Curated annotation (Swiss-Prot):
The protein's name in its UniProt record: Cystic fibrosis transmembrane conductance regulator
Binding positions for ATP 1 per the UniProt entry: W401, S434, G458, S459, T460, G461, A462, G463, K464, T465, Q493
GO CC term, one of those recorded: endoplasmic reticulum membrane
Localisation: Apical cell membrane; Early endosome membrane; Cell membrane; Recycling endosome membrane
Pfam families in the record: ABC_membrane, ABC_tran, CFTR_R
Main location group: membrane
Residue ranges annotated as motif PDZ-binding: 1479-1481
Role according to the record: Epithelial ion channel that plays an important role in the regulation of epithelial ion and water transport and fluid homeostasis. Mediates the transport of chloride ions across the cell membrane. Possesses an intrinsic ATPase activity and utilizes ATP to gate its channel; the passive flow of anions through the channel is gated by cycles of ATP binding and hydrolysis by the ATP-binding domains. The ion channel is also permeable to HCO(3)(-); selectivity depends on the extracellular chloride concentration.
Amino acid sequence: MQRSPLEKASVVSKLFFSWTRPVLKKGYRQRLELSDIYQIPSADSADNLSEKLEREWDRELASKKNPKLINALRRCFFWRFTFYGILLYLGEVTKAVQPLLLGRIIASYDPDNKTERSIAIYLGIGLCLLFIVRTLLLHPAIFGLHHIGMQMRIAMFSLIYKKTLKLSSRVLDKISIGQLVSLLSNNLNKFDEGLALAHFVWIAPLQVALLMGLIWELLQASAFCGLGFLIVLALFQAGLGRMMMKYRDQRAGKINERLVITSEMIENIQSVKAYCWEEAMEKMIENLRQTELKLTRKAAYVRYFNSSAFFFSGFFVVFLSVLPYALIKGIALRKIFTTISFCIVLRMAVTRQFPWAVQTWYDSLGAINKIQDFLQKQEYKTLEYNLTTTEVVMENVTAFWEEGFGELFEKVKQNNNNRKTSNGDDNLFFSNFSLLGTPVLKDINFKIERGQLLAVAGSTGAGKTSLLMMIMGELEPSEGKIKHSGRISFCSQFSWIMPGTIKENIIFGVSYDEYRYRSVIKACQLEEDISKFAEKDNIVLGEGGITLSGGQRARISLARAVYKDADLYLLDSPFGYLDVLTEKEIFESCVCKLMANKTRILVTSKMEHLKKADKILILHEGSSYFYGTFSELQNLRPDFSSKLMGYDSFDQFSSERRNSILTETLRRFSLEGDAPVSWTETKKQSFKQTGEFGEKRKNSILNSINSIRKFSIVQKTPLQMNGIEEDSDEPLERRLSLIPDSEQGEAILPRISVINTGPALQVRRRQSVLNMMTHSVNQGQSGHRKTTASTRKMSLAPQANLTELDIYSRRLSQETGLEISEEINEEDLKECFFDDMESIPAVTTWNTYLRYITLHKSLIFVLIWCLVIFLAEVAASLVLLWLLGNTRFQDKGNSTYSRNNSYAVIITNTSSYYVFYIYVGVADTLLALGFFRGLPLVHTLITVSKILHHKMLHSVLQAPMSTLNTLKAGGILNRFSKDIAILDDLLPLTIFDFIQLLLIVIGAIAVVSVLQPYIFLATVPVIAAFILLRAYFLQTSQQLKQLESAGRSPIFTHLVTSLKGLWTLRAFGRQPYFETLFHKALNLHTASWFLYLSTLRWFQMRIEMIFVIFFIAVTFISILTTGEGEGTVGIILTLAMNIMSTLQWAVNSSIDVDSLMRSVSRVFKFIDMPTEEGKPTKSTKAYKNGQLSKVMIIENSHVKKDDIWPSGGQMTIKDLTAKYVEGGNAILENISFSISPGQRVGLLGRTGSGKSTLLSAFLRLLNTEGEIQIDGVSWDSITLQQWRKAFGVIPQKVFIFTGTFRKNLDPYEQWSDQEIWKVADEVGLRSVIEQFPGKLDFVLVDGGCVLSHGHKQLMCLARSVLSKAKILLLDEPSAHLDPVTYQIIRRALKQAFADCTVILCEHRIEAMLECQQFLVIEENKVRQYDSIQKLLNEKSLFRQAISHSDRMKLFPHRNSSKYKSRPQIASLKEETEEEVQETRL
């Protein structure tokens, strides 16, 4: 970045913003880059501002019981805020004084007042000087207030971020990411631009008082008629605003429904294409869009009338002010024109400035209070450790994720004190200790010496991760003691990658040791992966490490933990995404050898790991089921397998699982008016808890204190759509919330009004920050294959589901054992955080405008209609003004003339009032014409928005995956949310405002030019200067806005990244470093935003200067060339002043239109995306046995018959090569093999070898070369949809969209209920569906959150059965499944797909044993394709991965009838040894 010219700029340069000229010049000539932006002044740096506010906030916390954030802000910014407010007031006062001078100038042209003619020129100079003074006062004042608002935002941004890093995990479990992002974006952005309006809360009343005093002097009591009309108008507009909000609230729900489906479609676009659901999804979304648009139109019409009321009220304000006075006393033209000028200013103050100011204060104070509440949230407490301690000891430890006894005691005591409860309520406190719920850990005891390995095992939800959190201090014990040295290293279950290089991720701020680094890289099997990158370990990874596979991310996370020199290493299921062989090697070389002298606690369920552990701790439902050595375990606990894996018997467990789902669903989904499931029923469910807990918690403390709320379904809100998308595979325990999410306008930290009154306390948690930390990085064999494309852009938009928020509190000790480097490479930051600049022009092209206008044929006619009505208005105005300016009303019989009055008086005679009748008639006509002009325009523009949405949706659904892989999911969703919202809401009204203002200015110039032709000569250069200046400014301003927008994304990305890795950050003590990173991101954004504000003010000031010159020319031309008659001078000067006040608004509107039209450009860019090849590339031939007709057309209602292709499922693959994008590197090369009908083929290979890619290639989701035939039919000879219909798919990431069970199973509505139930029976889904109210019509929301992952897999199986597919592709179907559910799926596969060809990609050994053939993929090529016997006899990857005992079990099964019953038992036993890769706290 360049050094800012502002630092050396002179006072004049700062006053006129001339220091911005270099960047304006460069932006006009070429595209601006980040390096062209100026460095921010030191006063604006996030470090300085946050330190200043933090100091005042700490002072506020220390000095008061009820600290107020606004007091801290006041001490930081009050005096500058007040100074600019006074400047603003003085600038506004000049507007009130100008009409006085105008009146004197008009009076000087009265034939009876020739004495003042000589001073008219001086009055004109004074009038012009007032305009100059106003310009010099207002622009610095507005810029100064914008600047203060920006500084306040930066300081509060930083304060909030620092607070997030200090929050206790218990608080994090009660908040959600979306609320936090909402707090930062929706609330804090109000300060940036709203602060300039804040002073009008006192300026506007003073302005009104001054103006009314001046109008009173002219018109006496009748002045209040105009004011009364304006107040009524303001109330009318407020009523319209309330009505508009009602429609918008109703519409928000419809938008939410559409965006939820759209988001699910985008996130699962690969599945949509695999299932051939493009048309079904398009129809569903368009139906929702249709309903939404009805409410959009209603809201737009109300807003249109609201806007029009302001434009057309001018006539009536003047008329109502003048008429009563004229009827009683008569009136002179001087008073009419002076009153018109006063009323222009008065109208703005009453109907715009004051209401806006009140709204600004309301919003700002609300935001400050939300932040204040947030900053007082409970903080993470650093535990006191003894560095000399060598062992790790835990004695009688019990802990709750909910508040412990101490916190609960204080809370209830405080509530009782606040409410002054009587003695009768005292037992409220004592009777509720039992309401704390089930402890997550109960009476845990163990002791491990230095250098020992403790293996922690247990079923899902047993408390394994909670145990590690306890040791780290993230979870506070309610009872017991924990003892260790405090020097901890931690590897999370879900790998966390920060933006930066691989090397930076591993070293993570610890001093660099080359030998140790190389040893760790080798032990974690990263050498081969790093060698593949051109930059080696210096390759920059984006947020979340999206360019890496799940296994690579897991190994980097493990390497980070191992590299740090610590006394205790906490490894939470670090091998989750590794293949069997890699896991085996890393466990031996890293955990057992490299870390042999270190104390290690490893969460695992692998039998091999337990055997090599010094001590074993098995947890069951939070309690210690066993603690000791492996030999003791075998002797004392022979039933340990069932506890380890979390089930006692297959049938019993599956029944309990289904019952618990039913009960939890009914309990949570009982809405108002529905009877909830009784709690006695709930007690019978699988979450084992004493009846005493269940009964007593009905009277929970907080339920007694606060009012009980009805349970509600937590649905996604529009806030979710801003960019963060979370993995949809979340368990029931975290997807449902009993605490209603806050809506916009509610307290952002909602009152905790409910403690769960059912036995399953842990089910209470919502999609909290804690939940995101433990689940959102659920990247499986890397979340979706599309995100692992090496060519995919780094995702800057937050990528987890935005729901809402509620968090934070005080300061953490700044002491850290690490030296933090303050120097941060700006290029790395840029590479990590910034997108490529959009490939659309900086300024909206004329082609975009033309394409937009011609999109709907009616729009052209509407624009022509607007022009015709405008010409009629101008003609009517000329007639009216001619009458006012050239008619003198003096009744000869009743004429009165006073030598004291220097003006002609209209006598109170009815025959003389015809001018007013004409005035009223013309005003009414113009009002009617104005409404008729705008309403069709708004209606038509919304119709255009409808067309654009339809075209874009169709284009995205038909785009090839190679194109979609280069786009971020958040970016696509922004087109459907942000850009469509702009097209619906902002663009139609902004275009209307711009056209309205433009016509007012042009009309005024036309009238002035007709009355005084010389003035027309002055308007020509002014219009030319305006057009050139606007074009000059727009080139730079739009580029600066792009840079600002690009700079905003990393702020939120960094926040989400930090929260995902918060436990890791704290374990490593890296909070100061991440605060520095956050400040750097803030400063990069500030640089662009501050420069944009400065250039905008430069432009506004130049526009005003041009029109000051124009007004000076108009004033002197009118004064020097006008002879007798005050009418002409009055009209000319009044209209010139009106031009001055209106033009700035028109200029801003023109810039807004250009800015909003960029959304249209982005939509057009999506509409113009290439489409998938839908037609066969070869001529279709007739095949034998009628397998394929000459013409096969795919329709929504195609139903496969038994004799239609494919019939057998034979596949022949020849020279298949696959790439993610055209011209990219080959992911698979020259793959050739064949599969017999009904055969089962297993895909083998290391993590990232291309197994999932091969399945995608079969479906033609990638750029492919070569040929594949199914039953003799080549993929080139039939349509794409036909080809994909041949396959049934069970993907890694299961796709459940918001809709009924029936819609999810059969979106095209082809099948009857009987057929669907039959298939549900086959796959074991009937018992699940039947337990939900409504059965097939039960609506699944939030990715099917009420279903387990296994039930979602069964849904996919049912879809495949319904599709009559002959070839089944399974991609890691057992990932994140407990063994029992996996057994159900295996059984369903055998029954429903007995005669189908099955291609299986799987890590579980026992699942692969049922395959007849195995395809081994290494280095993107086929290495082996043989039967299991041959692979085991040779030195193959499979042989290395499978243990000796497994091989001994296999051969009898394959070669001898003697052991026919063995495999089932052996397989089941192996099943029990598998790790369940999902930990719920």
